[in-house]
């Protein structure tokens, strides 16, 4: 049986690859794409979700816009990484085939979780955690019904927005605190893992050889992303963060994990937004959080390339 997921995202260059992977893998049933302010404003990331869905040939999957600001703090976006549009220099069509659902993303998440059998839906947030926290507060019963939360965010060794805080966490640390402290199972796919998911020249050559419109789209955004990484991050290749969370849902053996307590720093002058992972022994017996540690590089990129092949050239 395919694994049912709700992809809560802020597209975003690497979010686009996450959408392609979720749509193109037969082990995933994509129930909804929900959007949240993050890499760009809510209006821009929602438009980008429509764009990627059209390019991928996605039909029948609701796209719903969510929270346009964090729970407490001022909006922080990442145009310096993802571009003014949030999608590099990609051109937009006059209109989209995929329309935006009238429901608020938080309500859609609640509706889907409450209408499906318990423990059958995995939430996969790849942006800030505002929508997920709001859903848990608005309808607390979803916490026991959700199978797992597999999120891209955080980092137990280093940050990227600051020396210790990762972007998706620091843009709404209060929301992250709520999500990590609920009783559901949480898998944190953070920078320690995603910095291993590099779009190297040999990988991009394999994407090029797929030779479809979605593959060419991926190449275009990866070219932009790589140049940003080379100039801003001083890395030779871009780290493709968000699809790592989707890949874990498809096949947990794509990465190794360690079950450790994780909490979010909310008051530190230098450490706001830090995901504090406690690796000390003995580990708590009923720990509900785990962090991703080591990526199987070939298996991960094999999943992405296979998804591109399966998507083909949608009409």
UniProtKB/Swiss-Prot annotation:
GO BP annotation list: nucleotide metabolic process; purine nucleoside catabolic process
PROSITE patterns in the record: IUNH
Pathway: Purine metabolism; purine nucleoside salvage
Class of enzymatic activity (EC top level): hydrolase
Record key words, sorted: Calcium, Glycosidase, Hydrolase, Metal-binding, Nucleotide metabolism
CDD domains assigned to the protein according to its UniProt record, in alphabetical order: nuc_hydro_IU_UC_XIUA
Catalysed reaction equations from the record: inosine + H2O = hypoxanthine + D-ribose; uridine + H2O = D-ribose + uracil
Active site: 241 (proton donor)
Gene Ontology, cellular component aspect: cytosol
UniProt-annotated binding residues for substrate: 14, 160, 166, 168
Gene Ontology MF annotations: inosine nucleosidase activity; metal ion binding; uridine nucleosidase activity
Keyword Metal-binding annotated: yes
EC number: 3.2.2.2, 3.2.2.3
Positions that bind Ca(2+): 10, 15, 126, 242
Function: Catalyzes the hydrolysis of the N-glycosidic bond of commonly occurring purine and pyrimidine nucleosides into ribose and the base, but has a preference for inosine and uridine as substrates. Is not active on thymidine and 2'-deoxynucleosides. Functions in purine salvage from the blood of the host, a fundamental pathway since protozoan parasites such as C.fasciculata are incapable of de novo purine biosynthesis.
Subunit structure of this chain's protein: Homotetramer.
Name of the protein in its database record: Inosine-uridine preferring nucleoside hydrolase
Protein source organism: Crithidia fasciculata
Organismal lineage: Eukaryota, Discoba, Euglenozoa, Kinetoplastea, Metakinetoplastina
Protein encoded by which gene: IUNH
